[in-house]
Amino acid sequence: MKKNLSVLIAGLCFASLFVSCGGNKKAEVKGDVEAKGYTFGEEVTFHSDEPVTYSISFSDASWYAKQPEWESEGIFKDIENLTNVHLDITSYDSGDYNQKINLAINSGSATYIIPKVYDENPYVAGGGVVAVSDYIQYMPNFSAFVEKYNMNPDLDTIRQNDGKFYRLPGMHQAALQDYTIEVREDIFEAAGYNIRELEKDWTWESLHDVLLGVKKYMVSQGMCTEKDYIWSDLWCGESGKGTGGNLLKIMGASYNVISGWAMDGSNGGIKFDPAKKEFYSSSVSEDYKKFIKVANSFVKNGILDPETFTQSDDVANNKFYSGKTVIKSTNRSSMSNDEASLAKILGEGNYKLYVTAYPSGTNKNLAETSRLECGVMLSQKALDDLGTEGFIKLVRFVDWMFYSKEAYTLCKWGPQGKTWDYTEVDGMKIKQLLPGFKCGGLGIGGKDTDTDIRLKWGYAGGNYFYGHSTAESTDNFTPAVQDLYARYGKYKTVASVDPKAKPSEDQREQLNLWAVPLQDNINAWTLKFITGQKNIDSDWDEYVSSCKNLNVEKIVKLTNEIYAAQTK
């Protein structure tokens, strides 16, 4: 079922309409373990009387790589100054972060705190991570958020067969769609297309036709040749990790299928059919066939560069900034950098950039439906090394770092008075960077000579601030971004969240054994279909057979058996 979205723009409070309904269970805060040698509490700064060191993993993104200053004078030093906790950082390249933490967990050498985890399922059966749900009664900030925003139904979706969950997720008051598509509005207008009118009811098919017209215009003006592609996207190649990344995720959701980044943890594109009350594989459905035909049409007709699915993000961005392409993916963190890069290369006044509410397919659903996002695991090594009381102290520090308003603001904006302060705009008290600062991570641009607080000190990085209330998660939104979310509310809908089948450890292990090669096969075939290496009509049956040979039917059968058993 779908829920229509209406919009209230006061502080983007429209987003509260995304909140899912459910039971009224309350998180119980027992507080029956005395805090010896440290202070903690709901919106109380965690502080250890004696210096303490906790190890933590770090997903290091090349486009804002961790610098020594982050530890000596930036975010990590700020945390230590406030809490007396020194974070011993083990840094892994973001491209193979999951593989590296997997190796560390399996070898017993994992850090105590493991953030930036999207899918905890591969780590549960081995016993290398703690069932964190056993400790949430010691987490006052986490528990207060769960109670205030009725998060228990959402948390139920990540519980395992044993009734526990092993990842402390980022929790949103409301689901927010981050990734979308932006275009060179000036070129669309010159070609005779009003993108602001088109987006009100456009589809991927109609976008295809519009782009054919835009390319025809560009060829006539000598801006490109018939052999050139006018769309060469990012977050699909190296960062897409062989799945098609962001583009196939948002496009796939438009056709009620799982693809791209969404494929991770899906056991082969498994979705729930609410009419039949059973699970099926969307990856071998007619919807999937429709989706890849549409995606392929962009490549086949000379619009979308097949290098989209192999190139680095920098290459894709440079093609757009130099004017070789006129459409690409973006998100809130990238918008200001996109604007600044176009201004630097093309010159102010020589372009118009428009961030769209991306097209629909057979539905108008946004790709994001869950109020949960990536989160934090705690290793069994931490419990073994620290003992129960020491581990609970660690848990209370994590509660402050990831769930308190104070730490959220610090990790996102930096210290008040150093990088930002409050200002009053139209009678509203808002956060604003101080003169001389900008931040790509917040979508706040500036001069070339301004200091980017993410690059310099590590604020607004992707490792440590997740979720929170709508007011907090949108406190950096520019008027343009607020306008985008208003248009989402007008033109898009949100699908209900699928229920979860909760396998036992043995069942999970079996599903993983089947799912890994199956998903690799699905991803490989999908990219071959889209790039034209395989013919969708003549090779479709071979593709479906290959999925059956890799146990897609067994996965569906076992998933439905698990779900039937838990819903008796």
Predicted regions and their residues:
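Extracytoplasmic/secretory soluble proteins
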Residues: 8-568
